[in-house]
């Protein structure tokens, strides 16, 4: 970990830039408007959303916003966050642009499917290796170790996964 990791205070999320995966759970089906993408049926399951954080506040600011939720709908994930519950997150501190690389690795995991084409991938359509979406659904769960081991750019020792349990569901109201 780098020096900025010492500045972390909220759930150990650093202020540095990096790539992350937000783990959300949807216990029952929802029909949901997703900004300009349109309205979609979201089936129950585990949802993993791949993003990057390179702006002010780094990973802590971006993950904090997603964990807490926001009244302002800016990103596609803000719409899903209205009905889905955070269950955890992966992250890697890095200045490398690994978002699409991680997304491609996640897309090849057993049981992964794309619930909404284009979800979270607005920036990808300008790249030669465009991603179909940055949101993946796993109906029957996923293997945390298998996923972590498949992420390029890191190793098991520097890719962090924090999982919330029914006994530990943090209060996200104190983060911005």
Predicted segments — roles?
Residues 1-64, 68, 85-97, 137-176:
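GIY-YIG nuclease catalytic motif and its immediate N-terminal context
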Residues 3-6, 53, 61, 83-84, ...:
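A sequence-composition feature that detects small, non-aromatic residues
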Residues 49-52, 76-80, 108, 116-119, ...:
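Short, surface-exposed, polar/charged, turn-prone segments marking secondary-structure boundaries
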Residues 70-75:
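Cytochrome P450 catalytic domain signature, combining two hallmark sequence patches
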Residues 79-126:
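Mid-chain, well-packed structural core segment of small domains
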Residues 118-141:
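Long, Lys/Arg- and hydrophobic-enriched amphipathic alpha-helices
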């Amino acid at each position: 970990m780098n020096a900025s990791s010492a500045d972390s205070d909220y759930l150990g999320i650093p202020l540095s830039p990096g790539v992350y995966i937000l783990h959300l759970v949807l216990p029952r089906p929802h029909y949901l408007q997703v900004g300009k993408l349109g309205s979609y049926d979201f089936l129950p399951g585990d949802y993993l959303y791949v993003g990057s954080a390179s702006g002010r506040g780094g990973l802590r600011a971006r993950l904090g916003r997603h964990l807490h939720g926001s009244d302002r709908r800016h990103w596609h994930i803000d719409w899903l966050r209205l009905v889905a519950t955070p269950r955890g997150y992966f992250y890697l501190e890095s200045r490398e642009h690994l978002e699409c690389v991680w997304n491609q690795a996640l897309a090849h995991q057993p049981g992964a499917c794309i619930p909404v084409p284009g979800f979270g991938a607005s920036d990808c359509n300008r790249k030669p290796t465009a991603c179909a979406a940055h949101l993946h659904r796993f109906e029957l769960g996923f293997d945390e170790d298998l996923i972590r081991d498949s992420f390029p750019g890191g190793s098991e020792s520097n890719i962090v996964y924090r999982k919330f349990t029914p006994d530990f569901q943090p209060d996200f109201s104190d983060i911005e």
